[in-house]
A protein has these predicted regions:
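Membrane-embedded beta-strand positions of outer-membrane beta-barrel proteins
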Residues: 32-34, 58, 68-70, 95, ...
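Outer-membrane beta-barrel "beta-signal"
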Residues: 210, 214-216, 249-265
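Transmembrane beta-strands of outer-membrane beta-barrel pores
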Residues: 36-42, 62, 72-76, 99, ...
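Surface-exposed loop and membrane-interface regions of Gram-negative outer-membrane beta-barrel proteins
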Residues: 46-48, 63-127
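Residues that define the transmembrane beta-barrel architecture of outer-membrane proteins
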Residues: 28, 50-54, 87-91, 106, ...
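Cleavable N-terminal export/targeting peptides
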Residues: 1-29
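Short loop/turn motifs that connect adjacent beta-strands in outer-membrane beta-barrel proteins
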Residues: 22-29, 65-68, 100-107, 179-188, ...
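Short glycine/proline- and aromatic-enriched beta-strand/turn motifs that initiate or cap beta-hairpins
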Residues: 23-61, 65-76
Length: 265
């Protein structure tokens, strides 16, 4: 009997770590990022007038595919266009659901994002806060994303910006590729997008970008999560509508080269 009890105890002790190893991982995950950029360029348009930007974000995701996040950056265009008083920050709030489409190899992403610009808009200037819903489909290195705007004003463009009415119903379509170069840590990217502003067609434009990013963790473990990159962007935006007012007079849709360093946690 003692031998039997002893054997059962040993089996139990062996089973404890096995059971612990079999425990499921948490379905929740939290990540953060921070970066320094020589220019904040969004869809081909400089948001800082060629000046540097500090950016950071926090993201939550669930194994089901649900996600939420927030992100922030300094901006310059609100004050440079004399549209806002002390409007030098952008805060984004977003959420959605993403996952695989069966066994097709395709992925999907459905979500919404609110762009918030704290501050007071001057008389005669539209509110810059913008609401967007989006849908994307991906395959390997390629992504097609459609964004549709449901706010009356879209980044300050609307019935007070020389158009014929509100800009809700505007849209942006983008096609992009992000291709890793083997196991080198280098990733090459390219994208093309087209922005169409409802009732404000003078602001319509196409943009394109090529980029390269390198994972510094390939050089040293202490650099894990650090990425450096460079990107070239250009647009066919009309300078008459995308140039800041004097004394800056910066054409925000001009071709530009941006360098950056970021850290993911």
């Amino acid at each position: 009997m003692k031998k039997l009890v002893h054997a059962l105890v040993l089996i139990g002790l062996v089973g404890v770590p096995a059971a612990a190893m079999a425990a499921e991982e948490s379905p929740h995950s939290l990540s953060a990022n921070v970066g320094l950029y020589s220019d904040y360029v969004f869809r081909g348009i400089s948001q800082t007038g060629g000046e540097p930007a500090i950016q950071g974000g926090l993201d939550y995701s669930h194994s089901s595919g649900f996600y939420l996040g927030t992100w922030a950056s300094n901006v310059g265009w609100l004050e440079d266009f004399q549209g806002y008083q002390k409007g030098n920050v952008e805060i984004d709030l977003y959420g959605g659901f993403r996952g695989d489409i069966g066994s097709t190899g395709l992925t999907f992403d459905l979500g919404a994002i609110q762009y918030i610009y704290p501050g007071t808009n001057n008389s005669g200037f539209n509110d810059a806060d913008t609401s967007e819903v989006y849908a994307a489909i991906g395959w390997k290195w390629f992504t097609v994303k459609y964004s549709h705007y449901i706010s009356d004003e879209v980044f300050g463009i609307g019935n007070l910006s020389g158009g014929t009415g509100d800009a809700d119903g505007s849209d942006y379509l983008a096609i992009s590729a992000s291709v890793p170069v083997g196991e080198t840590g280098l990733t090459l990217g390219a994208s093309w997008g087209t922005f169409s502003f409802k009732n404000n067609g003078n602001y319509d434009y196409d943009d394109w970008k090529v980029s390269a990013a390198y994972d510094m963790g390939k050089l040293s473990k202490v650099m894990d999560g650090v990425t450096v990159g460079v990107a070239y962007t250009d647009t066919d935006a009309n300078p008459a509508f995308w140039t800041e007012v004097a004394p800056n007079s910066e054409f925000l849709g001009d071709s530009t080269t941006t360098v950056w360093i970021s850290k993911a946690f």
